[in-house]
Amino acid sequence: MPKFVVVTGGVMSGLGKGVVAASVGRILRARGLSVTAVKIDPYLNVDAGTMNPYQHGEVFVTFDGGETDLDLGHYERFLDVELPHRNNITSGQIYKSVIEKERRGDYLGQTVQLIPHVTDEIKRRLVEAAGGFDVAIVEIGGTVGDYEQLPFLEAVRQLRLELGGDVLFVHVAWVPILKTTGEFKTKPLQHSVAELRRYGIQPDAVVVRSERPIDANAVKKISLFAHVPQHAIFNSYDVDTIYKVPLLLERQGMGDFLVERLRLRGRSPDYGEWESFVARLSAPSRKIAVGMCGKYVELPDAYLSIVEALRHAGAALDVRPELVWINSVEVEKNPDLLPKAGVDAMVVLPGFGKRGTEGMIECVRYARTEKIPFLGICFGMQLAVVEFARNVLGLRDANSTELDPQTPHPVVHLAPEQESVDVLGGSMILGNREVEIVPGTLAAALYKASLTVERHRHRFEVNLAYVPKLQEAGLVVSGWRRDVKRVEIIELPAHPYFIATQFHPEFKSRPTRPRPLFLGLLSAAVEQSRR
C-alpha cells in the first residue's frame, strides 16, 4: 500500500503550497523512491480548460490530454514524471461521478449523501492515483476554512483513520513579521491549525512560509500551540528561485523526518544534478532580454511553463533570460513600443480570441524584419503564418477564421475534427501527438531526431490549401503530424532563428532536460548579441 503525504494550507492563498508539495516529492525522489502527486481543486468546474487565465493562471496539459491546474506542472518538473489527468481532482468531477452513479442505480436505492458517498468517491480516486507508487503527495487547494474544502478534508481524515501511520499531514501557513518591532507573529498560523483540528486533522509537520528565516522563539510558540514537535517544524522562507526549496527543506531535516515517520526505505539522498542546476540558475555569466508578447501578460502565471522552460534552457547555457512582458493590446495602440523594449529574442505566446491579436502579429513582423530570434507557440505559430501571408505573400486580408470568419484568405482555419464539436470543455485537440521532423531543417538540427512527441491544445490549424504558396514565398514546413496531415512546425531559413510550433514544447521541459526550441532561441540570441 502506498504512503500518503497530505499538504494543506492556512492563513491565506498564494503561499506556494504547490511548490512545497512538489519539494516534498523531490526530497523523496532524491532517495530513490517512486513518487506521484495529486492536486485537489475544490471548485465545481470539471477541469481547468474553460477557466479565465486571469483567474486561474496557466492551463497545464497532461500527456493524456487533461486540462489541469498549473501545480501539476510544478509536480512534473520537480519530480521529473509525466502525470495523468486523473491526478487533478475537482469537486465538479466528484459530484458529477456520484450523480451519474446514482442515476445508474449503483447505490441501490440509498440516500446519497456527502458522507459516505462523496467522501468514498474522493478516497477511491486518491487510492487509484497512488497505485504502484511508494508515496503519493496530495495537495488540497485553497485555504483551511473554505467551505469548498470540507468534503476533501473529511475524506483525508477518514483515510488517516483507515491507513493509520501511512498517512502524514503537512500544514503550510504564513507567519508575517511586524516590521516596526522585527517580531514574527505566529497567531494566524495557530488559528489555522486550530481550524484544521476542528475537522479532526492534527498536522504531523508544519512548513512555515515567511519572508526571512524564523527565529527559535517563533518555533517554540508554533510547537506549543500547534502541538507539533520542534523537529517537525520547517521553514520555507523567500529564496530567489523555487528550485532551492527542496534543498532548503532537506538541510532542515525534512527528508529524514519523512522517511522515519512513514517508515520508508530509501537510499542516501542524491541531489547532484539538482544542485548543479540550481548553481547554474543562480549565477549566470550573462543576461538576455526575452520579449514575451501576449494578451494575458498582466498575470505571468498564465504562461508559467514557458517561463520555466526559458529558465531551464538559460541554466544549461549559463544565461539568465530577463523577461520583458509586452502587452499586445498596447502594441496595437502604439507599435513604437517594440523598438523601445530592447529585446534580444521574442516569444509570441499562446492565446485565444481576437483581442490583442493585431499587436501579436506586429510582434511577429518586428522579429521577422529586424532579424530578432523568434519562437511562436500554438496561437503564436498561427499568427506567424498570418503575418507571413499578409506581408510576404501579399495576401493583405489573410487571417484565421477564429478571428475573422469572413476572411477571403483563411490561412488558418478550424481543424476538420472540430467542426462537429458543440461543447467547449475538454473538446480541443489535446495531449501527446507524434510529430515527424523534416530532415535538413532547423527543427531537425535542434531535435537531432526525425520524430518527437509533443503536447497539444488547439482547435485551429494552418490551412493546407495555402501551404504551397507559403512555401514558394520562403516559409518552410519542418514538422508534420504523423497520423494526419497537419502543419506542426514552421521556420524561415533566411532568418537567424525563426521557428514556431502548433504544439506546446514548454510542457515537457525539465530543470535538467531543457527543450530544444528554447535552447535554440537563447543560443541564437546570445550569438546575435555577440555581433
UniProtKB/Swiss-Prot annotation:
Additional remarks: CTPSs have evolved a hybrid strategy for distinguishing between UTP and CTP. The overlapping regions of the product feedback inhibitory and substrate sites recognize a common feature in both compounds, the triphosphate moiety. To differentiate isosteric substrate and product pyrimidine rings, an additional pocket far from the expected kinase/ligase catalytic site, specifically recognizes the cytosine and ribose portions of the product inhibitor.
Cited InterPro entries: Class_I_gatase-like, CTP_synthase, CTP_synthase_N, GATASE, GATase1_CTP_Synthase, P-loop_NTPase
User: What is the role of the protein in this entry?
Assistant: Catalyzes the ATP-dependent amination of UTP to CTP with either L-glutamine or ammonia as the source of nitrogen. Regulates intracellular CTP levels through interactions with the four ribonucleotide triphosphates.
Name the source organism. Answer: Pyrobaculum calidifontis (strain DSM 21063 / JCM 11548 / VA1)
Report the GO molecular function annotations: ATP binding; CTP synthase activity; glutaminase activity; identical protein binding; metal ion binding
Q: Quick one: which residues bind ATP?
A: 14-19, 71
The catalysed reaction is: UTP + L-glutamine + ATP + H2O = CTP + L-glutamate + ADP + phosphate + 2 H(+); L-glutamine + H2O = L-glutamate + NH4(+); UTP + NH4(+) + ATP = CTP + ADP + phosphate + 2 H(+)
Q: Into which EC class is this enzyme placed?
A: ligase
Q: Name one GO biological process term.
A: pyrimidine nucleobase biosynthetic process
Span list, region Amidoligase domain: 1-264
Q: In which pathway does it act?
A: Pyrimidine metabolism; CTP biosynthesis via de novo pathway; CTP from UDP: step 2/2
Q: Which residues form the Glutamine amidotransferase type-1 domain?
A: 293-531
* Pfam families recorded: CTP_synth_N (PF06418), GATase (PF00117)
Q: Which residues bind L-glutamine?
A: 54, 351, 379-382, 402, 459
So what family is this one in? Belongs to the CTP synthase family.
| Activity regulation | Allosterically activated by GTP, when glutamine is the substrate; GTP has no effect on the reaction when ammonia is the substrate. The allosteric effector GTP functions by stabilizing the protein conformation that binds the tetrahedral intermediate(s) formed during glutamine hydrolysis. Inhibited by the product CTP, via allosteric rather than competitive inhibition.
Name by which UniProt lists this protein: CTP synthase
Catalytic residues at 378 (nucleophile), 504, 506
Which parts of the sequence bind CTP?
13, 146-148, 185-190, 221
Known partners and oligomeric status:
Homotetramer.
EC annotation? 6.3.4.2
